[in-house]
Each structure stands twice: as structure tokens, then as C-alpha cells.
């Protein structure tokens, strides 16, 4: 009560922020007459002046009013567009490292030019992050004339760019690119072997467009760079054939109830579990099909991988639906459909073998599983920036998450013109068929009066169902979903025309405004060299149509189902009523919708259905509250999942930082011989301790074992026994010293043969590649630890604490193994001449660079993450060109040794 009273008197935090920023807006506006009087050359010279003032000690905040006034004036001259005051406020919010919630159509692209220009003056580069390549290219090309007028360079960062072009793009003052590509470049840079192979510079300032999509919807999905693992495609096919034999059980087994089904489904958490009966039945099938020995169990250590395959196949059949969660394209590939946007995501693959299981289910070619080489979550990548900001039309519902995870405050920016869209209450029907019939009637009525309609659906399947119903009703319409997204811009351009009907999956088309009356720019662009007279004529025609649409009520939004997140619903509504235009929206629901079916209480459902007749709809405040409560519940659960992922990933992130800092150190110095020398002493002391325990009696020493170990692992001939026989006064410490000195002399002899510089390069190469190999294995070990750690809860242990403790032990082991492996490899490399070492070093580098080139940059799918809450992924294969040499096979070089004891040490 007191809080509400105080808010009324002094305003909310948002109101106070806006009041403070409006004072700076006045200051910017005061510069306008002065800047209007400047010539183009004088205006352009402002950039040089600002940079000089920064060097002299002024701050970016002190330059802000003049810099924003400069951009506004340049925009008037280049585009004939003047930034509104609310856009200046949005620009200041972004510059302060906050999130600006700006409604659709309020000009976010133009707003971003203000903080981008100001922060680019610092010379450290500004990254403007978008959700897809199309928007990155569009926004970069749209704003390029403005930035170049002011003397700034603009770059574009998209996949598959040649290395020199990408490196040059990162040197630009302002760089547009996708969230995936920025993250992958960071990972690739940390797999490079030379500084000149890196592309990124420091991460200074990022403006994230559609920040809710990138930092929240995709926060559970790690970016992964992966290479090929072993082939197990035949096993997927064989297990896939068994799954249709399993029967679903409606209720979980308990003390009172034991069903005869084989699996149960938990729709809320998107999980499927084998029952006890199911486990026994699957084991019988496995034995029959020769996949398991008689009397064996799925849960024995030797069969863990079989259990993994069964679970993946079961989830593929039960939880993942064609044309909802994925499509099969013309090339016979399973392509994931993004649950948030309805777009296809080529190149992304589900984790934990799920993608291969879906491929087996669909009978298409099964790609190999891949092994993670490097990974990072968006949460941890974007927290690397010195200053981070974002903009979106819908952030306020997630303000708490932005604040608690990223430390970003959300500021709601007022619209330039008052919002007059009419958001009508939800209507609820008993069945989906009744709901669709009502939607068709509503569309018919709107089309008759010339009002454009946008219908939002939750999946491709639903959009096609509705499309078929509209065809039967002879209503002309366009469908915008993952299957047709190459026509997206064209369909969106038509969506605002009188009487046009557009069905869009989720928020496909996001980032492109629906202009009432259609897009006159699209018509101009379709003409070859139009004259000014023709352009004016097109504009005049468009104005008439635009006014006609406004009179009919503006764009009408129909939602066919409530989403799990209120934010996605708000995004759909936000397509209408842009810049003070007329518009309306309504959601049509049925008791068969997944949100209502899963989250509405049985009592509420029975109460609603008992009093309803066929075709009858209800509008009820109680029901609306119940739906909102269900959405809040789901949002809370999803927030907890993301928070938990971050807590686990933070452990890996600390280790990632240590490994990447070590890599940076290795790459920035030419000579690591001191480090190698220090490691050699450490490793040899440890080996000697095993055979000559410190401060022990001579009778306890295993001198023969020590001699053999030194010879086998380090190629050192140290006749320790003979030394003792020759000098019985040789005490333990002196003996240790003698062994280490022998190792040093042997290594120095190698150095004299090949030359110091060549050996220095070889040491660095061995160290980097050994570190990369061990880090890759460590990631796999961390992944396995993460998957089973929740079971510690049954032993009354805290899974997170256990994960931290065990991952720390694993990491300590990695650092120790790194030392010993590098010392062993360098000790055992036998070289006769300089050319041999140079050839081997070149061979190692070529292999590593080839592996890096062929490694796949992947983004594990959000749907899989929700389903299994795992942390890593398996992805598209990289096909090996020749047969892999087994570790115990003879080495192909002809030395007569086993591969693992010869070139296997190098590779």
C-alpha cells in the first residue's frame, strides 16, 4: 500500500529515469539550430573533433549531447529522417548499458545509430547484434550511408566469410552481425595457432537487437564447435525398429499402482521415462536382437550407451513431431524448427544423439555424432563485453531476469504517438475444431470490410491446418512459415494491404514492419530505374490505400493459441498499432490447446466444459487470470532452468578462462623453454617419487622400475642402479639431481642437432595442440559428469557442490596431464636433423589447422535443451577422408613401432 502511494507521489523508477533523460533531450535539441547551420564538411569534421577531445580526457557521456545532435543532423541530410525525442531517449538508455523496450515500428534500427556512433569514437569497435543474417545485412546497408557520411567504417559479420574479409570486418568502427557468428568467432579464435589467424579484437560495446530472443529464448543453448566422433549409425537404426513395439502408460508406477505400459510421458517437463515393465520388455527385445547378452541389464556399466540410444529413440518417437519440431527438407535432412520464431535452423543439431534418433525414425541418412571441441553459452559470451545493451519490443515481462543474470536494467520507452490498438479479451471454445470455425468467421467479416488480418500460429502443422480451412472457405491468403521463409520479405510487404490475410508461424517475419496499405518501397524496388514522377505516383496511390486500411480498423491480429510466454503473445500483438495507427487483436483458445490442457486445473476444465454447448464461446476474467497464472508458472520454470544452466556453466566458464588465458600467453611469446624446463623438473620429480619415496630407506627403492619408466616414457637412459653401485655414498637428493641433469643433457643434445629456434617453435606447437586435445576430452568428461550429477541428490548430497568439487578435480588433473604429456612427447621425439623437425612441426600445424577448418560450428537446439537440460550437443559430421590408424597398429611411417609409441605421440 505504502509502495503504491510513494509511486503515485514520486513516480516509478522508470518515470524518474525518463524525467532525467528528457533534460538531456532538451540539451540535444538546443544544439539543433547550430548544427543545421553547419556545412556538410563542418558536420563531418565533428567526428575528428570528438576523437581529439576524447584523447584530451573528455568522457563519452560528456560528448553525448553533441554526438547525438550530430547523428540526428546527419540523418536529416542523408535520409531526410529526423530522430524523434523518444529515439534520443532510447539511444541514451542503450549508451548507459541498459535495455530499451521500444514498441514495434518505433524505429529501433535508427535509434541504434546514436549509441553506435558515440561509442565508436573510442576506436575499440561497436558490435550491433541481430538474430539472423538477413537483418544484419539489411541494417548494415541501411545505415552505411549515414555512418560513412560521418567518417565511420561499417562491417558485416556473417557465416562463411573468407578469413581476410572477416578480419577486416572486425577492424570496422561499427560491425553488424549475428549472435551465433560473434560467439563462434570467439571460440575459433581460441582454437587458432597463430595470433594472425585470430579475427576479433577486444569486446567493448554491444547493442543486441531483439535482446529477449538472444539473451533469454536462446540462453539455454550453448554454441558448440565440434569434430567427428565414432560412427554408431547402425545402432540407431536397429534400436529405432524396437520403439514402435512399446506401449504408452497413462500414469506413473507407484506403491499403489503398477501399470502394464512400457513408458510414461511428462508433458510439462518434456520427458519420457521407461517403466519397470518397459525396462524388462526392452531388455528382452535387446537380447532377441543380439544387442545384449542373456541375463544382462540395461543399467549395467557396459550397457550405458545402449540405454542412451533407447532413451534418444523413445524421445524422438514420443516427444518430437514432424512439421512441428522439425521438417525433412528436399535433400532428406532433418532440419530443426525454432520453437520461438517458427524459422528453420539449418546446420543446428539436437544434442545427446537425439538428432540421429530422429533421422533413424524418418528413415533418412544418419549423420555421425560429433565431439565437442569448444563451447560457450550466450550468457557467458555476452558477459565478456565491457558494456552490453539491448533493445526489443517486449522486455518488461523479463526485466527481473535481465537484471539478475546480466545486470541490465530495463527502461520502457514511451511511444512517439499514443497507442490506440484495441486488445480484445480472449474467447475460449471447447474444441479446436470449434475454435477454427470461429476464426474463419472472424477473418471473413474482416476481409469483407477490407481490413488486413495477421493470424499467428504456434507450429507449421497448425498453420497448414488453418490454411486448408481457409482454402475450403475460398479465402485468399499467404502462409509464412519455416517452409516458405525465403519469401518472407515479399509476404510481409503484402500483409498490410486491404483485405489481405497472412498466416505466420509464431513470430516469423520479426524485424520487418507490416506497413498498412502495403510497402510502396517494395513496389519501387521491383521497377528498373523508376523516375521521380513514377515514385511520387506510387506514393500517392499508397497513401489512398493506407487511409482506406486505417478506416477499416487497421491491422487485425488473431492469435490461435496462447504461448508459454506472455512475451511471445505481446510480440504478436505488437505487429499491429505501430506509430499510433489503428489496430486490434484477439486470441482464440480451446480447451484442447496444450497450455490449457497441461496447466489448467481439472476442476477449472470440468467447470468450463460442463456449461458449454457446441460452438459456444466464453469470455471470463477468471479464465484469463487462470491462463496468465499458467504462463507465469511456465516462465518461472524456464527462468529456473536458465539460471541453473548458468550456475553449472559458470564452473566450466572459470576453467575456460584459465585455458584461454594460457593459450593467449603461449601464442603471445616465441620462447616457452623456461616453462618446458620447469614442467620437466616437476614431472620427473613426480615420477622419481613413485619409485624412490621421499625420505625412505634404500630397501624401499624400485630402481629397476625407475630405469624402465624413464626409458619407456621419456627415452632417457639413466643407469640408476649402476650409479649407486659405483658410488655407495650417493644419497637420495643427489640421485634425483643426476636423473634430472641427464634428462636436460639429452634434450640439449637434440637442440644442438636441430637448432634452438626450430625446437622453440616445435615446443610451442606441441604445447598448444596437447592443451587443445586435453581440453576437448575435458569438455566431454564435464558433460558426462553434468548428466549424472543429479543422482547425487539421492545420497543426500548437493549436486551443484558435488559438480563444483569433481569438476575442479578433473581440471587439476587436466593441468597435471598437460605437463606430463608435453614433457613425454618432447622427450621421445627423435630427430636427426633440422629439416626433420621442421617437417614434423609443419605436419602438426597442418593437421591442427585442417581439424579446425573442418570442425563444425553448431548451436545445440533450445528444444533439446528444454527436453534434457543438458549442456552440450552432438552435431553434423565431418567425414574422415582416410581410415583412422588404431593406436596399437604398426605406425605407417615404417619404424616398426606401434602407432601410439611413434607418430601417435605427435598426432
Curated annotation (Swiss-Prot):
Query: Looking at the keywords, is Transport present?
Result: yes
Gene Ontology annotations for the cellular component aspect, listed alphabetically: cell envelope Sec protein transport complex; cytosol; plasma membrane
Q: Which residue windows does the record flag with biased composition (Basic and acidic residues)?
A: 841-853, 872-887
Binding residues annotated for ATP, in chain numbering: 87, 105-109, 513
Which Gene3D superfamilies does this chain map to? Helical scaffold and wing domains of SecA, P-loop containing nucleotide triphosphate hydrolases, SecA, preprotein cross-linking domain
- Residues in a coiled coil are none
State the EC number(s). Answer: 7.4.2.8
Q: Name one GO biological process term.
A: protein transport by the Sec complex
**What's the catalysed reaction?**
ATP + H2O + cellular proteinSide 1 = ADP + phosphate + cellular proteinSide 2
Q: Which SUPFAM superfamilies match?
A: Helical scaffold and wing domains of SecA, P-loop containing nucleoside triphosphate hydrolases, Pre-protein crosslinking domain of SecA
* Entries under Pfam families matching the protein: P-loop_SecA, SEC-C, SecA_DEAD, SecA_PP_bind, SecA_SW
* Database matches in PROSITE patterns: SECA, SECA_MOTOR_DEAD
Biased amino acid composition, Low complexity: 854-865
Keyword list, A-Z: ATP-binding, Cell inner membrane, Cell membrane, Cytoplasm, Membrane, Metal-binding, Nucleotide-binding, Protein transport, Translocase, Translocation, Transport, Zinc
**Main site of residence?**
membrane
Gene Ontology molecular function, alphabetical? ATP binding; metal ion binding; protein-exporting ATPase activity
Residues of the region (Disordered) are: 841-907
Entries under InterPro entries matching the protein: Helicase_ATP-bd, Helicase_C-like, P-loop_NTPase, SEC_C_motif, SecA, SecA_CS, SecA_DEAD, SecA_motor_DEAD
Q: How does it assemble?
A: Monomer and homodimer. Part of the essential Sec protein translocation apparatus which comprises SecA, SecYEG and auxiliary proteins SecDF-YajC and YidC.
Q: HAMAP family from the entry?
A: SecA
What is known about what this protein does? Part of the Sec protein translocase complex. Interacts with the SecYEG preprotein conducting channel. Has a central role in coupling the hydrolysis of ATP to the transfer of proteins into and across the cell membrane, serving both as a receptor for the preprotein-SecB complex and as an ATP-driven molecular motor driving the stepwise translocation of polypeptide chains across the membrane.
Family label? Belongs to the SecA family.
**Name this protein carries in UniProt:** Protein translocase subunit SecA
What organism is recorded for this protein?
Vibrio vulnificus (strain CMCP6)
Q: What is the lineage of its organism?
A: Bacteria, Pseudomonadati, Pseudomonadota, Gammaproteobacteria, Vibrionales
Amino acid at each position: 500500500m505504502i509502495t503504491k502511494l510513494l509511486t503515485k507521489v514520486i513516480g516509478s523508477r522508470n518515470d524518474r529515469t525518463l524525467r532525467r533523460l528528457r533534460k538531456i533531450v532538451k540539451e540535444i535539441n538546443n544544439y539543433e539550430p547550430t548544427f543545421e547551420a553547419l556545412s556538410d564538411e563542418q558536420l563531418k569534421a565533428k567526428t575528428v573533433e570528438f576523437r581529439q577531445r576524447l584523447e584530451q580526457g573528455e568522457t563519452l557521456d560528456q560528448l553525448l549531447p553533441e554526438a547525438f545532435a550530430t547523428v540526428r543532423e546527419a540523418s536529416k541530410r542523408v535520409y531526410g529522417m529526423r530522430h524523434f525525442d523518444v529515439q534520443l531517449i532510447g539511444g541514451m538508455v542503450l549508451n548507459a548499458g541498459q535495455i530499451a523496450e521500444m514498441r514495434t515500428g518505433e524505429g529501433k534500427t535508427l535509434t541504434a545509430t546514436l549509441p553506435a556512433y558515440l561509442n565508436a569514437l573510442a576506436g575499440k569497435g561497436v558490435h550491433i547484434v541481430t538474430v539472423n543474417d538477413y537483418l544484419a545485412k539489411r541494417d548494415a546497408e541501411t545505415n552505411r550511408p549515414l555512418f560513412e557520411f560521418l567518417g565511420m567504417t561499417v562491417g558485416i559479420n556473417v557465416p562463411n566469410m573468407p578469413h581476410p574479409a572477416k578480419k577486416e570486418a572486425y577492424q570496422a568502427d561499427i560491425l553488424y552481425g549475428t549472435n551465433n557468428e560473434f560467439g563462434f568467432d570467439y571460440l575459433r579464435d581460441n582454437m587458432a595457432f597463430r595470433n594472425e589467424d585470430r579475427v576479433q579484437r577486444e569486446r567493448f560495446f554491444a547493442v543486441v537487437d531483439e535482446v529477449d530472443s538472444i539473451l533469454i529464448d536462446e540462453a539455454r543453448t550453448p554454441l558448440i564447435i565440434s569434430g567427428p566422433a565414432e560412427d554408431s549409425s547402425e545402432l540407431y537404426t536397429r534400436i529405432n525398429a524396437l520403439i514402435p513395439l512399446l506401449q504408452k502408460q497413462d500414469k506413473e508406477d507407484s506403491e499403489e499402482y503398477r501399470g502394464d505400459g512400457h513408458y510414461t510421458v511428462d508433458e510439462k517437463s518434456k520427458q519420457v521415462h521407461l517403466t519397470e515393465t518397459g525396462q524388462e520388455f526392452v531388455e528382452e527385445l535387446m537380447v532377441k536382437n543380439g544387442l545384449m547378452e542373456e541375463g544382462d541389464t540395461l543399467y549395467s556399466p557396459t550397457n550405458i550407451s545402449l540405454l542412451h540410444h533407447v532413451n534418444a529413440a523413445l524421445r524422438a518417437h514420443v516427444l518430437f513431431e514432424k512439421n512441428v519440431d522439425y521438417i525433412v527438407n528436399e535433400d532428406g535432412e532433418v532440419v530443426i524448427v525454432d520453437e520461438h520464431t517458427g524459422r528453420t535452423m539449418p546446420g543446428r543439431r539436437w544434442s545427446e544423439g537425439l538428432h540421429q534418433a530422429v533421422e533413424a525414425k524418418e528413415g533418412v541418412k544418419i549423420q555421425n555424432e560429433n565431439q565437442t571441441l569448444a563451447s560457450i553459452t550466450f550468457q557467458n559470451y555476452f558477459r565478456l563485453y565491457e558494456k552490453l545493451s539491448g533493445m526489443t519490443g517486449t522486455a518488461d515481462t523479463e526485466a527481473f531476469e535481465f537484471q539478475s543474470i546480466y545486470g541490465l536494467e530495463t527502461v520502457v520507452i514511451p511511444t512517439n504517438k499514443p497507442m490506440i490498438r484495441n486488445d480484445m479479451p480472449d474467447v475460449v471454445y471447447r474444441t479446436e475444431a470449434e475454435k477454427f470455425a470461429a476464426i474463419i468467421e472472424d477473418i471473413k467479416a474482416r476481409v469483407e470490410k477490407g481490413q488486413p488480418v495477421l493470424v499467428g500460429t504456434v507450429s507449421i502443422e497448425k498453420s497448414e491446418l488453418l490454411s486448408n480451412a481457409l482454402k475450403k472457405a475460398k479465402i485468399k491468403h499467404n502462409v509464412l512459415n519455416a517452409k516458405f521463409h525465403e519469401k518472407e520479405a515479399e509476404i510481409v510487404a503484402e500483409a498490410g494491404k486491404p483485405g489481405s490475410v497472412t498466416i505466420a508461424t509464431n513470430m516469423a517475419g520479426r524485424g520487418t514492419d507490416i506497413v498498412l496499405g502495403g510497402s510502396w518501397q517494395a513496389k519501387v524496388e521491383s521497377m528498373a530505374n523508376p523516375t521521380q514522377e513514377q515514385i511520387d505516383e506510387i506514393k500517392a496511390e499508397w497513401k489512398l490505400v493506407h487511409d482506406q486500411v486505417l478506416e477499416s480498423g487497421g491491422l487485425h491480429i488473431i492469435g490461435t493459441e496462447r504461448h508459454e510466454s506472455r512475451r511471445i503473445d505481446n510480440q504478436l500483438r505488437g505487429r499491429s498499432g505501430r506509430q499510433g495507427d489503428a489496430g486490434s487483436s484477439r486470441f482464440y483458445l480451446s480447451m484442447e490447446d496444450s497450455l490449457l490442457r497441461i496447466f489448467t486445473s481439472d476442476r477449472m476444465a470440468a467447470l468450463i466444459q460442463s456449461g458449454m454447448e457446441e460452438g459456444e464461446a466464453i469470455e471470463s476474467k477468471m479464465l484469463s487470470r487462470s491462463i496468465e497464472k499458467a504462463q507465469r508458472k511456465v516462465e518461472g520454470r524456464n527462468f529456473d532452468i536458465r539460471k541453473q544452466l548458468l550456475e553449472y556453466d559458470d564452473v566450466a566458464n572459470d576453467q575456460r578462462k584459465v585455458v584461454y588465458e594460457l593459450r593467449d600467453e603461449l601464442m603471445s611469446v616465441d620462447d616457452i623453454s623456461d616453462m618446458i624446463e620447469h614442467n620437466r623438473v616437476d614431472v620427473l620429480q613426480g615420477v622419481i617419487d613413485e619409485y624412490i619415496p621421499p625420505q625412505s630407506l634404500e630397501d624401499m627403492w624400485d630402481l629397476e622400475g625407475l630405469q624402465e619408466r624413464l626409458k619407456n616414457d621419456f627415452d632417457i637412459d639413466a643407469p640408476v642402479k649402476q650409479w649407486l653401485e659405483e658410488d655407495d655414498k650417493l644419497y637420495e637428493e643427489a640421485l634425483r639431481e643426476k636423473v634430472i641433469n641427464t634428462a636436460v643433457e639429452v634434450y640439449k643434445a637434440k637442440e644442438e642437432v636441430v637448432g634452438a629456434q626450430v625446437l622453440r617453435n616445435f615446443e610451442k606447437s606441441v604445447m598448444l595442440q596437447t592443451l587443445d586435445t586435453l581440453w576437448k576430452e575435458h569438455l566431454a568428461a564435464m558433460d558426462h559428469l553434468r548428466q549424472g550429477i543429479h543422482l547425487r541428490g539421492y545420497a543426500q548430497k548437493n549436486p551443484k557442490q558435488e559438480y563444483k568439487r569433481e569438476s575442479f578435480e578433473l581440471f587439476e588433473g587436466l593441468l597435471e596431464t598437460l605437463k606430463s604429456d608435453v614433457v613425454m612427447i618432447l622427450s621421445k621425439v627423435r630427430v636427426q636433423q633440422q629439416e626433420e623437425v621442421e617437417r614434423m612441426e609443419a605436419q602438426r600445424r597442418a593437421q591442427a589447422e585442417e581439424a579446425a577448418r573442418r570442425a563444425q560450428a553448431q548451436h545445440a537446439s533450445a528444444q533439446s535443451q528444454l527436453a534434457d537440460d543438458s549442456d552440450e550437443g552432438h552435431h553434423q559430421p565431418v567425414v574422415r577422408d582416410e581410415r583412422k590408424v588404431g593406436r596399437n597398429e604398426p605406425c605407417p611411417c615404417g619404424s616398426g613401432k606401434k602407432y601410439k609409441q611413434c607418430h601417435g605421440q605427435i598426432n
